[in-house]
Amino acid sequence: MEGRRLYPIGIQTFSKLREGNYVYVDKTELVYRMTHGASGYIFLSRPRRFWKSLLTSTLHSYFEGRKELFEGLAIEHLEKEWTRYPVLHFDMSTAKHMDKDRLLSELERKLYGYEQIYGRDESAIYTNQRLESLIKRAYAQTGQKVVVLIDEYDAPLLDVVHEEKELPKLRDVMRNFYSPLKACDPYLRFVFLTGITKFSQLSIFSELNNIKNISMLPEYASLCGITEEEMREQMGEDIGRLADNLGVTPEGALGALKSNYDGYHFTWPSPDIYNPFSLLNALADSKLNSYWFGSGTPTYLIEMLNKYHVKPQQIGARKFLAESFDAPTERMVDITPLLYQSGYITIKDYSSLTNLYTLDIPNKEVRMGLMKSLLPNYLHQYTADGLTPVALLFEAIAGERMDDALRLLQTFLSTIPQCDNTDYEGHYQSLLYTIFSLLGMYVDVEVRTPKGRVDMVMRTPTTLYVVELKLNKTADIALEQINLRNYPERFALCGLPIVKVGINFDSGRHTLGDWVIEGSMSC
């Protein structure tokens, strides 16, 4: 371990990172640009564990004029004055899982901490009055305009985003708290708010109509996260260690990191952005694992997936206008805005002709994590042990033994209690989609052809499978439909051998009844 670099895993305080000689990916040129733009009110949305808190802490140190922390960084040569401003930094992550009264108490506690520094106007009773008084007193006592930093502004609301009764109550508390910011404009140097989701300006910042949302601006695409160039420049030695552990070349290790943790884009065009939490953990441990997803899938996400009756295949590649996903979550009519803003889907392409963005799951880690979370919707009493048969399935399919794979699947499904209402074909289509996605395969459903829709298309690095499903019929009927409608013709230019698979499910036994596989045809 001697000589290994220190990665700031879980460290969100800029001063601790710099003083502890941890690896820091320099974002300070963007920090300088952001703090010297036309707008002094900035909002940034990024998924959890994407260094939003570290960015907020960086701003805190910068506005406190702590030049010594920025030695060797880009901003050292850009900033000439290093003025010390009074900073009010509110971390709202401590206000999760609270009702209205506890939330008010938590806000009062935060205000009290700064009132110990700048004093309190006893006539200011409510949280909005106390915040306004704090800003004015800090300005009067220091002679400098005040910086307000609000990290995870939406944390008090995320747990109740699906609760129609509780959300308005907590939203009103937060709206009241933020309300003085516009009136205090003469006393403010900079206001920065960051969080995961985008709540409507009217609902939270009804008085603050001059916030600039930089979440989808190309110049800030890499403000949070790590680009491939940054990774190659600063982490090459540890990529080599990972390669040794995996038994591959450094380029092979880079490919594995890319497929597992890369693929985020928050605008278009944009460099590929790696999930910083997963990437740094993988390099620190010299192994691949489900770090980001394993660190905690929010309860609210699973509850919203169920509320909107989201099927696994609905999370794949789809096209949207920006206002359909970069939209306030409390007004959403489907789950797309929440999935996008939470980092479970991301931008993959954009058409300037139609203004449509293609959104898809960013990488293998997120895809497998999502499917693990959704599998219990189809299988009762599902546990992590259930992944062992899935791993055996992967081994069979990787060896091009589809017959063995389906036999394993038949046994697996027959031994696990199923959910209710399984007597329709779509249930089994969703179940297969989820399981085969867990294997890391490319899976698509209801694929259009000139003569109808294919139930499912699966692709491995070596083979393309055209699959037709039937319920309480026969596999021969399914295969006959594939041949009659000549579905494989649609994929003639795929460059892979095509295998036709007819599968019949037996709803009485809750598993595969029979199947038939027709050998590969080269395309």
Q: Across the structure, where does each feature detected by a protein language model lie?
A:
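Active-site metal-binding core of divalent-cation-utilizing nuclease and nuclease-like domains
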Residues: 138-142, 435-461
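Metal-dependent nuclease catalytic cores in nucleic-acid-processing enzymes
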Residues: 177-184, 337-345, 433-437, 481-501
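Conserved catalytic cores of phosphodiester-cleaving nucleases, focusing on short active-site segments
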Residues: 432, 456-471, 485
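Domain-level recognition of nuclease-like catalytic cores that cleave nucleotide substrates
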Residues: 490, 496-523
